Amino acid sequence: MNSRIIKTSCTAIALLVGVGILWLAYTTFQSRYLRPFDNQATLFDGSQLRLPAELAGPGPIRVVHFWDPACPCNVGNQQHLADLVSHFAGDGVSFHVLQKPGSRGQLPANLSALKPLASLPGSEHLPASPAVAIWDRQGHLAYFGPYSEGAVCNASNSFIEPILKALIDNRQVTASNTLAVGCYCPWAG
């Protein structure tokens, strides 16, 4: 009789400990990775962005990824960015990255092809990240804004593929001011 009570008690305690561990894991995940979707519109104004002197002027199509390592919104666009690099790097497109000043972090290995920039004139006025700026072959800003609109970023809802395809086909694109709703983190401060 005593051993039966001990077995039942041990099973109940193990079950409670297991439920407690699952609850702790769930709440930790939720507080760290899940957050309410902020449907506030963000205006991306590229009027003050300039390429650094060493990249300015005629050359390849240049894509600059604005990256804040602490922003949880990066998770959604990093695989998409890696796909862009693998698809368009051979088509005369160079990929660069500007890390948020004062932040610390390292890009994932699949984004090691992005060339780091120390600074980019006008980037101190960025409203949010992740964001992207694309300059055409003549060195004119063709696009500035988010990768996509909405809570998730992927090729099916991306603004970037059509713009890069148009620029590769030598069609003019002018979209340096964009209003979008999505997962973004403040860049300034």
Specify the residue positions occupied by each region the protein language model found.
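N-terminal targeting signals for export/organelle localization
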Residues: 1-47
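Intrinsically disordered, low-complexity terminal tails/loops enriched in metal-binding residues
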Residues: 37-55, 83-88, 185
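Conserved helix-turn-beta segment immediately C-terminal to the redox Cys motif
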Residues: 49-50, 61, 78-99
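Sec-exported extracytoplasmic/periplasmic mature domains
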Residues: 86-90, 140, 165-172
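Short, polar loop motifs at secondary-structure junctions
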Residues: 99-105
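Short, internal strand/loop/helix patches
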Residues: 107-146
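Thiol-/selenol-based redox modules, centered on thioredoxin-like
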Residues: 147-189
